[in-house]
Curated annotation (Swiss-Prot):
Encoding gene, per UniProt annotation: cca
Organism in which the protein naturally occurs: Buchnera aphidicola subsp. Acyrthosiphon pisum (strain Tuc7)
GO BP of this protein: RNA repair; tRNA 3'-terminal CCA addition
HAMAP family named in the record: CCA_bact_type2
Positions contributing to ATP binding: G8, R11, R91, R137, R140
Keywords: ATP-binding, Magnesium, Metal-binding, Nucleotide-binding, Nucleotidyltransferase, RNA repair, RNA-binding, Transferase, tRNA processing
Protein name per UniProt: CCA-adding enzyme
Cross-referenced Gene3D superfamilies: Beta Polymerase, domain 2 (3.30.460.10), cca-adding enzyme, domain 2 (1.10.3090.10)
Taxonomic lineage: Bacteria, Pseudomonadati, Pseudomonadota, Gammaproteobacteria, Enterobacterales
Reaction(s) the record says it catalyses: a tRNA precursor + 2 CTP + ATP = a tRNA with a 3' CCA end + 3 diphosphate; a tRNA with a 3' CCA end + 2 CTP + ATP = a tRNA with a 3' CCACCA end + 3 diphosphate
Described purpose of this protein according to its UniProt entry: Catalyzes the addition and repair of the essential 3'-terminal CCA sequence in tRNAs without using a nucleic acid template. Adds these three nucleotides in the order of C, C, and A to the tRNA nucleotide-73, using CTP and ATP as substrates and producing inorganic pyrophosphate. tRNA 3'-terminal CCA addition is required both for tRNA processing and repair. Also involved in tRNA surveillance by mediating tandem CCA addition to generate a CCACCA at the 3' terminus of unstable tRNAs. While stable tRNAs receive only 3'-terminal CCA, unstable tRNAs are marked with CCACCA and rapidly degraded.
Cofactor: Mg(2+)
Pfam families in the record: PolyA_pol (PF01743), PolyA_pol_RNAbd (PF12627)
Domain of life: Bacteria
Length: 414
């Protein structure tokens, strides 16, 4: 029985990247042998075991044969006579099909090291097309490695297009799609992920809302599209915001704020909270079961997008209503998230010399002015029930209005 380090740990080591998880393949072993050595079996579809001390994953070498549709339609052979090369050939990319033995020697039957040197993301074999999940994985690896000069091999992109054409993507679960998307959003260049999906014709299947951004003819409001929603501007913005902020909810929210404009042709200046735009994002998040902490910021930022961009002109009453709508009194961190996004949009979309304070900074300043209005004084005055809410809202509006009037001479806003 021989044990080899495989997959991402070998790849990242060769790339001088931090190694996060170590996966091992066991050649010539059996379930019985590993269980006798106190390994814990955890795999459902095929035998995977946790090391009794390190808790790293050890999988029996296996062969796979396509027997059905989608990424789960495989028959697996984990017999002890399966060779290392037979195990490696079933992997998606050459850079992920390198093994390392206990002495540090590399076993690289598919020239993965050469592809790493050349910066090439290339499939291992023609069986690549049997697993539709690989479309998302390749797009994600492109986003992960583009800063190191990697690109997708032309023949691999061709196979990705074939997978899409065969309609294999329909067998992917929403959970699988989001898992890969979430990983991509955490990379240095998440915009590359969506661009690759567009180039292999998969974007319209996974994210039809985003696909519309590539189809200008679908936009009703042409002038708005040209100014704010050109696909290159949006993807460039996603690239830029990712340099400034690592939070996935912020990155995702930036992207989402544009996804409803293809259906809208209205007077934005009169909108407090755009329920229609927010509902599109809410439906998207529901479709992929996106975590609530990401969904909530995305929905709020989209709904208040135009309000926040014109916050200098908004009434104190509406600003207080915004804080209540986003539940800022209990979740002040939401104000920081929305302020960051608003500042970013402000600096990209408007001439900042018009104002002495950015829209997001103004939002945070307003919140700092009113967040400590005391409810104790209201209770002492005998207010009860709904009257308490009305009175604290009135006091917050009054305090904010006083601050704004007092500071007009300092030109905090027009």
């Amino acid at each position: 029985m021989k044990i080899y380090l495989v997959g991402g740990a070998v790849r990242d080591s060769l790339l001088n990247l931090p190694v996060k998880d170590k996966d091992w393949v066991v050649v010539g072993g059996t379930e019985k042998i590993l269980l006798e050595r106190n390994f814990q079996q955890v795999g459902k579809d095929f035998p995977v075991f946790l090391h009794p001390e390190t808790h790293e994953e050890y999988a029996l070498a296996r062969k796979e044969r396509k027997s059905g549709k989608g990424y789960t339609g495989f028959d697996t052979d984990c017999n002890s006579d399966v060779t290392l090369e037979e195990d490696l050939i079933r992997r998606d990319l050459t850079i992920n099909a390198i093994a390392q033995d206990e002495y540090g020697n590399y076993i690289d039957p598919f020239q993965g090291k050469k592809d790493i040197e050349c910066g090439l993301i290339r499939h291992v074999s023609e069986s690549f097309i049997e697993d539709p999940l690989r479309v998302l994985r390749v797009a994600r690896f492109a986003a992960t490695l583009v800063h190191l000069g990697f690109k997708i091999a032309e023949e691999t992109m061709l196979l990705m297009c074939i997978i899409v054409k065969k309609q294999e993507l329909s067998y992917l679960t929403s959970n699988r799609i989001w898992n890969e998307t979430e990983k991509a959003l955490k990379t240095l260049n998440p915009h590359v992920y969506f661009q690759v999906l567009y180039e292999c014709n998969a974007l319209h299947f996974f994210f039809p809302e985003m696909y519309f951004l590539y189809e200008k003819k679908n936009f009703l409001n042409r002038s708005f599209f040209k100014k704010f929603c050109n696909k290159n501007i949006i993807l460039m913005g996603l690239a830029e915001i990712s340099l400034l902020n690592k939070d996935i909810d912020v990155r995702f929210s930036y992207l989402c704020q544009f996804l409803s404009v293809n259906q809208i042709d209205r007077n934005y200046s009169k909108i407090f909270f755009d329920s229609y735009a927010a509902s599109i994002i809410h439906s998207l998040c529901k479709r992929f079961k996106i975590p609530s902490y990401i969904r909530d910021i995305a929905v709020l930022n989209t709904g208040f997008y135009f309000f926040l961009n014109t916050i200098h002109y908004q009434s104190s009453k509406n600003i207080i209503n915004l804080f209540s709508k986003v539940d800022a009194w209990r979740k002040p961190d939401r104000v920081k998230k929305l302020a960051f996004l608003s500042n970013f949009n402000f600096l990209r979309n408007f001439k900042s010399e018009f104002f002495c304070i950015k829209s997001g900074c103004f939002l945070e300043k307003c919140f700092s002015v009113v967040k400590n209005v005391s409810i104790k004084l209201i209770l002492k005055k005998g207010f009860k029930g709904y009257e308490i809410k009305q009175e604290i809202t009135r006091l917050r509006i009054k305090k904010l209005e006083f601050w704004r009037i007092k500071n007009i001479k300092h030109r905090f806003y027009l």
